[in-house]
Regions:
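N-terminal pre-catalytic "stem/leader" segment of glycosyltransferase-like enzymes
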Residues: 1-74, 106, 201, 384-387
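Active-site proximal beta-strand in glycosyltransferases
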Residues: 85-119
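Donor nucleotide-sugar binding/catalytic pocket of nucleotide-sugar-dependent glycosyltransferases
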Residues: 135-149, 153-170
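Nucleotide-sugar-dependent
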Residues: 210, 260, 264-294, 303-314
Length: 387
């Protein structure tokens, strides 16, 4: 009879995933692909919508990793696995990247149309119930680990930063500048749910538009002036930005694309500068620095909002934008970045950030983080019968 047990003992990791978001792509799909093609780290990842509990597969499973579990169905699955994990010899791991959780009051963004919904609060309660059942919970930054542990008091949080897959971000490394830049290809993006255009409520009453993260500085005025004066060639990703409606014929707008297509798309744009606006709030402190490392791997500079415990504190000093910055200050930052010596330093700094800190998905340092989560190869496998 064919057996999936082999000399590695327990070679399989079951990643229980759902959805098609960028969170799943960067936290599950891309790492799983890199782990599986190397073959030399002793595990093979199987992405599944629910745990596979056939005796043969279960006895070959070293770990179950759940992506953002937060409902009654997930809770039931995790409870059942927690009851048998010690006897069956596997680890239970959960991953929450920027999962909205109830930290210091409502974490919902104030401009989200749904506000602090019952749905989100219910998610938080399931999370709190499940937290003690996991051997390890991975998150993307120290702030999220610290704040979640203050709620659950489980001390099982490990920071696993996001990484970028070099095989998908395939743009060649840009050469150094020989002269200063005076014109810039600038790319802005962001979830359309993080800003709300003017609309009518359920009673037909007019509701003013909310700018969301674009309110963190005079970003919109800065973009409009740059486009008008010809020093910014602006590309809006993720669909139309309602605040740029009056210059829509002077800019390029690209629709949302699936996560697997996004890296090659943004690489082909050959952006000089990527905009990363964020307001200073709890939700954004829970976010990762993904936009920063995406810019780094594309040899692009970035202009990013910074604040205490924010995700972009590791950006080059010349790239940082303070809360409330004026359009003139933003313009000064842009042209300061365009000075050839500054530009070359910033781009090199970005590459050193991702290479030296294991922020490339297929790097040994990045893969080792996952191997540690899944546990070492057992010396002896004792078969377990789930029946």
């Amino acid at each position: 009879m064919l057996s999936i047990l082999n000399n590695n003992g327990k070679p399989y990791v079951q990643m229980v995933t759902a959805g098609f978001s960028g969170c799943r792509a960067y936290r599950c799909d891309f790492p799983a692909t890199a782990i599986n093609w190397t073959g030399g780290i002793g595990v093979h990842v199987i992405e599944v919508p629910m745990p596979l509990l056939d005796n043969g597969i279960l006895n070959a499973t070293r770990a179950f990793m759940f992506k953002s579990p937060g409902n009654a169905v997930c809770y039931d699955m995790v409870c059942q696995l927690a009851d048998i994990k010690d006897k069956a010899g596997f680890r239970l791991v959960a991953d929450y990247d920027d999962q909205p959780v109830y930290i210091k009051g409502c974490i919902s963004l104030p401009w989200e149309p749904w506000g602090p919904t019952k749905h989100k609060l219910e998610d938080d309660q399931w999370f709190i119930k499940m937290a003690p059942l996991f051997d390890t919970i991975t998150v993307t930054n120290e702030y999220l680990a610290r704040e979640l542990d203050a709620i659950t008091n489980t001390h099982n949080y490990v920071v696993v930063p996001n990484t970028v897959p070099r095989w998908l971000f395939s743009a060649p490394r840009k050469p150094q500048l020989a002269e200063d830049k005076t014109k810039f290809v600038v790319v802005g993006s962001g979830c359309p749910l993080h800003s709300t255009g003017p609309h009518k409520d359920e009673n037909g009453k007019d509701v003013e538009g909310q700018p969301g993260d674009w309110a963190s500085a005079e970003w919109i005025d800065f973009i409009k002036e740059g486009v008008s004066e010809g020093y910014i060639d602006y590309i809006q990703m993720g669909g139309p930005n309602w605040m740029l409606e009056d210059i829509k014929d002077k800019i390029r707008t690209l629709p949302w694309v699936p996560p697997l297509r996004f890296p090659s798309l943004i690489s082909r744009l050959n952006a000089d500068v990527v905009l990363a606006p964020l307001v200073d709030c709890v939700f954004n402190k829970c976010k990762s620095d993904l936009r920063l490392i995406e810019a780094n791997v594309c040899s692009s500079a970035i202009m990013c909002s910074t604040f205490a415990d924010g995700p972009y504190e590791n950006a080059h000093q010349l790239c940082k934008v303070s809360q409330g910055a004026t359009k003139d200050q933003l313009k000064d930052i842009l042209f300061t970045l365009g000075k050839k010596d500054n530009w070359n330093e910033v781009i090199e700094y970005g590459w050193r950030n991702i290479l030296d800190n294991g922020r490339i998905t297929e790097s040994d340092q990045a893969l080792e983080r996952y191997v540690k989560l899944f546990g070492s190869t057992p010396e002896k496998v004792v078969p377990f019968d789930i029946m």
